[in-house]
Amino acid sequence: MARTNLISEVERRRRRKYMISAAFRYTLLTVVALVMIYPIIWLVGATFKTNNEIFTSINFIPSKIDFTPYVNGWKTRTKFTFTTFFINTFSFVIPKILFCLISSTLVAYGFARFNFPFKKICFSILMATMFLPSVVTRIPLYILWKNLGLLNTYVPLIAPTVFANEPFFVFMLIQFMRSIPTYLDEAATIDGCNSFGILTMILLPALKPALISCTIFQFVWSFNDFLGPLIYVTSLAKYPVSLALKMSIDQSSGIVEWNQILAMSFLALLPALILFFCCQKYFVEG
């Protein structure tokens, strides 16, 4: 009887200790989550405020819901609306994603499944480029595209992805492919599959989580890219969303409509958020 009571007491203490620890962890996580998400909450609230209310009220809840910032912000002060800017953005973001996935998968397949001369040296060079700042190559690339007469087009933004210029994605896909057993390749070879068939019918279905992760990363990076379009795109008619938002901050008139800028900034966040939440399951797996 005494032994049973002792075990029960130990169990109660253990359970109490676990509950206190869990309460502390969840409280800490909740506080951190609120701190991280507060800027987004404030951004959403500020899109419905007037300029004066944005700078005079610390409350993120607007005094009244007003969609005027969204309407006027979408129209802009030019002859182009944000419809044009979003179309421009997707017109080079989507090709970048497709070419990046194709080229990165092919390069990763070569490194993960084939042996060839100087393989380790080539892989080392590939990994070394991960530590090379992209700004280092801006001037040489600008001169190249200028000599080719391709400035003020989206070609300088899209073309590098054809040649697997994202070593991070290549490295991630290589590691994912190495986790797939090679006996699947051998079985497919016995059944008459060639190398391309093994890639398309065996490896690609297994690579789905990794490919979706690459898609999310590339979409966010390309959609938010400011420096690339700023260097290569000069025509207002071809501006992406990132440049259009900067254009909206017009100091020449003396008045900056921050509520409109924040409204368009929130709309610019939505595509990436929607993509992430739709593919969250595969992103975690990848």
For each feature predicted by the language model, list its residue ranges.
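Membrane-interfacial, low-structure loops and terminal tails that flank and connect transmembrane helices
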Residues: 9-10
